[in-house]
Amino acid sequence: MSENTSPSIAAVRDLREASCSPIGAPTVTNDLSENVILTSLDDLHNWARLSSLWPLLYGTACCFIEFAALLGSRFDFDRFGLVPRSSPRQADLLIVAGTVTMKMAPALVRLYEQMPEPKYVIAMGACTITGGMFSADSTTAVRGVDKLIPVDLYLPGCPPRPEAIFDAVIKLRKKVGDESLAERRKHQQTHRYVTVSHQMKRVEPVVNGSYLRAESQKAALAAAPAGQTLATDAAVLTPAAEPLES
């Protein structure tokens, strides 16, 4: 081939080097490069918020004792930037730990309404999430705090260990880091929760001593052999104490 139609080896080498690194080396000095950060507004805003969550501690029962263990030197609660606040107007994270009763429900809702946006809620413990062991017999326990305020993260356990609380905080930090300012403004009005004037529905008391006459007892009577009856008196069900031998 002629020289006009076939490029030289040196020209091909120069073209390959130019295509592999089409942009030259930056002219920014080392001192200046360590002081310049290229980021977006969402990333900068989310990084500042997830690194300095200020919780409002709402502890009503034994779950809060596990949370109090985080304040010691063994778990180092402050390394996540969490600074407990005593005023809801200075907090952006509400940690509900323990049973929520009908009488305390308006106070909890008022605390949530006084917190500035954006705000988050962690439901800690079985009693907070579903009512726990008080959901069957108690007439004053709220069956889930999400019936009062929106919950961002559920932390099951009875009670949860301090390591589980750390895991919940880490997951909440990831959620905060993935948020967008534009999307949060769109979905902010979709969060619905009751107000302090909400009338709680009360149920009939079930602690009346009639457990032996419940549906489960009726099923046991139906399954019993013919001619055999089950005792329905608590005194009969309680075994008598055996006499002591002298």
Swiss-Prot record:
Protein's cellular compartments: Cellular thylakoid membrane
Enzyme class: translocase
Keywords linked to the UniProt accession: 4Fe-4S, Iron, Iron-sulfur, Membrane, Metal-binding, NAD, NADP, Plastoquinone, Quinone, Thylakoid, Translocase, Transport
Enzyme Commission (EC) number: 7.1.1.-
Pfam family, one: Oxidored_q6
Superkingdom, taxonomy of origin: Bacteria
UniProt topology in membrane: Peripheral membrane protein
Reaction catalysed by this enzyme: a plastoquinone + NADH + (n+1) H(+)(in) = a plastoquinol + NAD(+) + n H(+)(out); a plastoquinone + NADPH + (n+1) H(+)(in) = a plastoquinol + NADP(+) + n H(+)(out)
Main location: membrane
Details of cofactor binding: Binds 1 [4Fe-4S] cluster.
Function text: NDH-1 shuttles electrons from an unknown electron donor, via FMN and iron-sulfur (Fe-S) centers, to quinones in the respiratory and/or the photosynthetic chain. The immediate electron acceptor for the enzyme in this species is believed to be plastoquinone. Couples the redox reaction to proton translocation, and thus conserves the redox energy in a proton gradient. Cyanobacterial NDH-1 also plays a role in inorganic carbon-concentration.
Family affiliation: Belongs to the complex I 20 kDa subunit family.
Name of the featured protein: NAD(P)H-quinone oxidoreductase subunit K
